[in-house]
Amino acid sequence: MKVCLLICPKGNDSENLKRIASSCAKGLEENGIQSDILNVSVDTDKRLTLYDYLIFIAEPISSFGKDVTPLLKKFLENAGTVSGKRAATILVGGIRKNATMATLMRIVESEGIILKTSEFISKPGEAKVFASRLNIERNY
């Protein structure tokens, strides 16, 4: 199994999202699952065809806003075959969490990705526990 952790920062980079993604990777590694971390703002030419499961880790553009980075939609359009892949979404920060999560889910599902679970996470420790309990298996 191969998992891709996609961080979606409001700018080009976010240390908090990187820490949460690396904690998720450690949690997945405990279960013997390989993972790669990609930044949708920087790694625009990467393909997601090789991955079995996707985990989107995003933050809202502003504290009161409900939008995530518009680069996510462009990244998914150019990422190869993503339709039918299973995914989880993690939202970090913001005041209007439910509205932001709905926006993130809408973007992910519009590309044909099957959303299995979603979570609001604020600390790297929570991310590690979430990833270690994530049910990632191949469905043939």
Predicted feature descriptions by range:
Residues 2-140:
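FMN-binding flavodoxin-like domain, especially the glycine-rich phosphate-binding loop
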